[in-house]
């Protein structure tokens, strides 16, 4: 049996701006300037949606995506704001299974909580998974603190004051790759891994390097099912669900998780294809009561053990 996961994690990379007379050409950006954006779909666990004011209007519901450094708005929002799309201004978005040049638009302001951005270029899509008005990437999150209360269904973005975790919370030290991407060190069983924390992904993904290391310990891991990840232009990429031993990230221990393993394009874009790596999605993060991402402390704080089905 094959499970179809439509756009489970469309990790898109905005790598250039197209300008010209009518038909733009897209220029590649240097490696250090690459920007990521990942649309989100509805899931059983939940999504993190923030109310966002754009050009003084709104609020618009945008999905907070820590795997995206580039924000995205829908065509519906463009129309509501009375903005004009110019055919010679585009962003090239690379997905898990392909790439697509999409229109871009300049925003005067984008505001939510302590996040205030001005003169911001964003990509425009016809729709966003989950019915949101857009995707809130983490561009400009330096020095901020994101607090998500899953019990009260609240998200707040404030200036970090360097607060430590509460007495009943665990912590996961993080590193910032490309300046904004949250990467933590951990273990899957006895295997050391790099894990990307991605609130825009429904399902946790693993790369081939981790899969191969697990299958060499076959008594601990068993392939369960095929999976198809459908990306841009309906291009598909195949992976395998594998029952995965305990994942340990900082003080968090995650048991009983089935992870999709494949030659996932986003690991290559992140430079993580040659070492065991995970992309930790909302199937794990959404099982928390409280999640705090402190970009100044470079730390993740969480309440409660992970309650996975």
Residue ranges, per PLM feature:
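Positively charged n-region of N-terminal signal peptides that target proteins for export
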Residues: 1-4
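Bacterial N-terminal signal peptides
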Residues: 6-16
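Pepsin/retropepsin-fold aspartyl endopeptidases
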Residues: 18-309
């Amino acid at each position: 049996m094959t499970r179809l996961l439509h756009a489970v994690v469309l990790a898109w990379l905005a790598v250039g701006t197209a300008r010209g007379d009518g038909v733009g050409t897209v220029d590649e950006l240097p490696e250090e300037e690459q920007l990521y954006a990942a649309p989100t779909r509805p899931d059983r666990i939940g999504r993190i949606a923030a109310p966002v004011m754009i050009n003084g209007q709104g609020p618009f519901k945008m999905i907070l995506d820590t795997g995206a450094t580039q924000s995205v708005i829908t065509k519906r929002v463009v129309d509501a704001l009375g903005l004009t799309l110019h055919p010679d201004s585009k962003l090239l978005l690379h997905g898990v299974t392909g790439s697509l040049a999409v229109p871009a638009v300049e925003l005067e302001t984008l505001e939510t909580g302590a996040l205030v951005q001005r003169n911001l270029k964003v990509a425009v899509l016809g729709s966003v998974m989950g019915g949101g008005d857009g995707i809130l990437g983490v561009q400009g999150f330096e020095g901020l603190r994101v607090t998500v209360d899953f019990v009260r269904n609240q998200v707040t973005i404030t200036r970090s004051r360097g607060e430590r975790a509460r007495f009943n919370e665990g912590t996961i030290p993080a590193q910032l790759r490309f300046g904004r991407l949250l990467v933590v060190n951990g273990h899957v069983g006895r295997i050391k891994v790099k894990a990307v924390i991605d609130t825009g992904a429904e399902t946790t993904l693993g790369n081939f390097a981790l899969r191969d290391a697990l299958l060499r310990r076959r008594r601990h891991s068993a392939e369960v099912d095929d999976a198809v990840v459908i990306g841009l232009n309906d291009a598909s990429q195949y992976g395998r669900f594998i029952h995965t031993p305990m994942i340990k990230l900082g003080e968090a221990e995650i048991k009983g998780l089935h992870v999709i393993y494949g030659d996932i394009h986003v690991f290559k874009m992140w430079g993580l294809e040659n070492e065991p790596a995970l992309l930790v999605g909302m199937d794990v993060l959404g099982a928390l009561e409280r999640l705090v991402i402190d970009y100044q402390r470079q730390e993740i704080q969480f309440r409660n053990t992970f309650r996975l089905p």
